[in-house]
Amino acid sequence: PKATGIIVTDLMYKHWDEWVTTAPHPFVADFDGNAISNIVDILNGEPYESPMKPWGGIEQLAWNTTSDKVAYTCRKKTGLEYAISTNSDIYVYDLNTKKTENITEENKGYDTNPQYSPDGKYIAWQSMERDGYEADLNRLFIMNLETGEKRFVSKAFESNVDAFVWGADAKVIYFTGVWHGEVQIYALNLTDNSVRAITEGMYDYGVPALFGDKLIAKRHSISMGDEIYAISLDGKTTQLTQENKEIYDQLEMGKVEGRWMKTTDGKDMLTWVIYPPQFDPNKKYPTLLFCEGGPQSPVSQFWSYRWNFQIMAANDYIIVAPNRRGLPGFGVEWNEQISGDYGGQCMNCLLYTSPSPR
């Protein structure tokens, strides 16, 4: 029988679940309300991706406030150099002059996800410092578009800045970030670079959007999938969707608690413990030890469709999920300790620091 195949002569040949055969490009066009015209490929004739595969989306592109410039994320490399490098940059394409400017050329790690401020005076983006290090600290930078001055504004937050959105007055940026096993929404004051937590509790928040004097964001936890919430800037939350209420009303979830315990080298480590729905402290239960992969990804209040703790607990297991060494949310040193020590202290955290359920 006939067979097909792919001959690979260079990298990058595959991203997770897809072969690399095409490169997405950003286009701009005129729109009169009915149809588009004057279509322009910003990367015409170039072999580069924007948005970048495999995860990039529309968040890697941004219009300026006067709609005559487009900022985009791109790693302008090919072959082996592309495969091993994280050196992407923020480029600004001028629709009038057709010229492109690299505004992050001096930084050698990831630069991604540009956003212009509402007043048109600044541009913000996420930035990692080191080339080839995908788990580097994800920092927030802003640049004054008139002077070119750049500032690392999230220095007070010793963890990754995830999704972010400008405040209406361009004096505050709201962002999500993981800290101590929870992903909360924070307010970054650009006057003094101070950071204030807006939300709290055993939840993970995601993709905040500004709507008047409130934020709209999704929220989930170990015990509930995503729902949409309105968040006042003082932290008050209002649930807007109840997509799965009828299902949840029929279920009994297990108790979730966080415990701090000492590691073998004397550090404090947060561990999530999830109990069976009808836990009896007088009974003995088998325990499942959850070993987070990545390796540098957090054990937060995530709701997983693959590793769902509540489904495990519903089968009469106690789940132990340590935030072992080598993941974000506990400072840079904690996250980076695993580099060069994979199988060392992180395994000690998993195997020799197990709590006894009370």
Annotate each predicted stretch with a short phrase:
Residues 1-25, 45-57, 73-89, 102-112, ...:
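A flexible loop/linker signature enriched in serine peptidases of the S9 family
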Residues 3-8, 12-42, 59, 69-71, ...:
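Non-catalytic accessory segments flanking enzyme active sites
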Residues 31-34, 94-98, 145-148, 189-193, ...:
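Short loop/turn segments that connect beta-strands within beta-propeller blades
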Residues 61-69, 114-122, 164-172, 208-213:
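Blade-terminus and WD-like Trp-Asp/Gly-His loop motifs, strongest in beta-propeller folds
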Residues 283-293:
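Short beta-strand element of the alpha/beta-hydrolase
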Residues 316-329:
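Conserved alpha/beta-hydrolase
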Residues 331-348:
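Catalytic nucleophile-loop/oxyanion-hole region of alpha/beta-hydrolase
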Residues 352-358:
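Conserved small/polar residues in nucleotide/adenosyl-binding loops
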